[in-house]
Amino acid sequence: LIRLTSCENILIQGVTIQNSPKFHIVPQKCNNLIIDGVTVRCPWNAQNGDGIDVGNSSNVLIINNTIDAGDDGICMKGGAGNSGLANGPCVNINIQNNKVYHAHGGFVIGSEFSG
């Protein structure tokens, strides 16, 4: 629903996002991102209903969010294969005071990682 690519100095705060057909918030190759006080609502039986999927990003703060996800609640991804190696890892990710309900995994690392 919200996809950010190669962005800097972003604040997502105090919004409710629900019933995305796939992942809800997807920052990719971003730097200096804060996701604060966001509510994600997704049916428990939704496929690929990830809450927040951070990929190849740095200096990210995920704080005070409530996530009701059909799949992964908060997920770190580095990309698969050669694209993952070329785009770089997730670096300096800080996750604090989040509530995750009904997810297959509250916090997940490694579903797409190279190297």
What is each stretch, according to the model?
Residues 1-115:
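Extracellular/periplasmic carbohydrate-active domains that bind, remodel
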